[in-house]
Structure formats: C-alpha cells, structure tokens
C-alpha cells in the first residue's frame, strides 16, 4: 500500500483489517510504502504513533495493551529462514526499513494454512514447525507470498502477525524470511524493529524498552 497522506488512524485501520486475524482468510501482514520524503526520526515517530494507535484498538478489543518486547535499530545483511521472532504467543512485528542501496527481498509464509492442510493435527503441526521452519522450504511454496514493490530507496513499514496460537481461535501468525540480494558491507541496510506483545490491561512490563531512546538514538546495532 502506497501511503500518500500520513493519517495514523486510517493506517491503523488497514493494519487491523489485515493483520489481526483469527482465520487464514486475511493475509496476516500489511506493507506500507511512505516514499522518500521523510527523515529517519520522522519515520520512527510514525512507527511509534502507529503502535500507540493500535494499542488503543487492542485495549478495547482484547483488554490488552501492546507492550514493547523489543525495540531496536540494526544493520541487517544476513539471510534468514522462515521463522517467527522470539516473543509471547500473541505478538506482532513491526519492521521499519530505511532507504538503502542494499537490495533485499521479504517473503511471508502462512504456516497456519500449511498446518491446516497437513495430515497432522493442526496444533501438533504448529508446535513442530515453529518458531523456525527447518524442513524443506519447497513444502511451504503454495503458502508463500513475496512482498511486492519492496523498493529499497523508500521508507517502508511491514507489520506482521508474529503469533503462535496455543489454541483456537487465538490470533494467527505468519512466518517471515529475508533474502539479501546484493550484500555489501560498505553500505548500510537499516531496519527499525519492534516486537509487540499483547499485555493484559493492568499488568506492567518492568523491562519494557525505552520509546524515547528509540526515537532519539543514533546507535545502530550490528
């Protein structure tokens, strides 16, 4: 989705409709392209505003806030397998990509649909294949989506359902996988990464990362 006007409430609604899923009829992710006319600080501020808007929704819908499990900026030029990031069973991943000369591709795989179509009972299959898919990736091929128009010269957010359901109907996640097409250690590929857990209202995460530090830091992890 190309974002022509930064309306956080509208963007959040798109995320809610596509990512907060309890069936495989929805994709479980959304790709937002903000173009080139932003600064890194402005971009990170959009990410934080979007997270906070989505937290209003989860508070009303699930009586749970979205709490930071992980909040960091890093320079990533490493291929990954299909996987879920380490987090609570009901969680979300917000990846904010800054413009880069390093070409990359992002793939999503609906592991829940794969599990439903397998000959093994769904919850048993999910337990076996998560958090990292270690089997032949060709088995996932019918369930894989390559994120289109993943232009490396623009600011982009990909918001992903990172959940691992223990029972149904909990929210259903999707795997993600990155492929670095042209690695180049002389250049940077900066990813702003948020992992968000559903935290029951009233509970406090004493180890929650600092939102202010994320917005103002110049530190890039390797």
Feature locations, PLM:
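N-terminal auxiliary "cap/dimerization" subdomain that precedes the catalytic jelly-roll/cupin core
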Residues: 1-61, 216-222
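Short, well-ordered loop/turn elements at secondary-structure boundaries
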Residues: 25-28, 76, 87-90, 151-155
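A structural signal for short, well-ordered beta-strand segments and their strand-loop junctions
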Residues: 30-33, 93-95, 105-107, 157-161
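Short, solvent-exposed loop/turn segments at secondary-structure junctions
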Residues: 36-39, 99-101, 163-166
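Conserved double-stranded beta-helix
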Residues: 52-114, 128-132, 139-144, 198
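Short, surface-exposed, charged loop/turn segments at secondary-structure junctions
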Residues: 108-119, 171-180
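Short, cationic low-complexity segments
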Residues: 113-135, 216-222
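Catalytic core of Fe(II)/2-oxoglutarate
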Residues: 135-222
């Amino acid at each position: 989705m190309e974002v022509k006007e930064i309306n956080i409430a509208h963007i959040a609604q798109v995320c809610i409709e596509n990512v907060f899923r309890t069936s495989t009829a929805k994709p479980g992710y959304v790709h937002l392209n903000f173009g080139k006319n932003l600064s890194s600080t402005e971009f990170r501020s959009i990410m934080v505003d979007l997270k906070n808007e989505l937290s209003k929704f989860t508070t009303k819908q699930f009586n749970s806030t979205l709490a930071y499990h992980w909040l960091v900026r890093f320079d990533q030029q490493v291929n990954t397998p299909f996987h879920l990031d380490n987090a609570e069973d009901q969680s979300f991943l917000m990846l904010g990509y800054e413009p880069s000369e390093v070409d990359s591709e992002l793939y999503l795989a609906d592991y829940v649909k794969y599990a439903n179509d397998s000959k093994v009972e769904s919850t048993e299959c999910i337990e076996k294949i998560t958090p990292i898919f270690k089997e032949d990736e060709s088995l996932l091929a019918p369930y894989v989506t390559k994120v289109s128009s993943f232009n490396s010269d623009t600011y982009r957010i990909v918001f992903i359902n990172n959940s691992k359901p223990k029972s149904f109907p909990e929210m259903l996640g999707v795997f993600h996988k990155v492929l670095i097409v042209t690695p180049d250690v002389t250049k940077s590929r900066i990813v702003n990464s948020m992992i968000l857990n559903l935290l029951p209202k009233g509970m406090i995460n004493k180890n929650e990362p600092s939102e202010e530090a994320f917005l103002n830091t110049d530190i890039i992890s390797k």
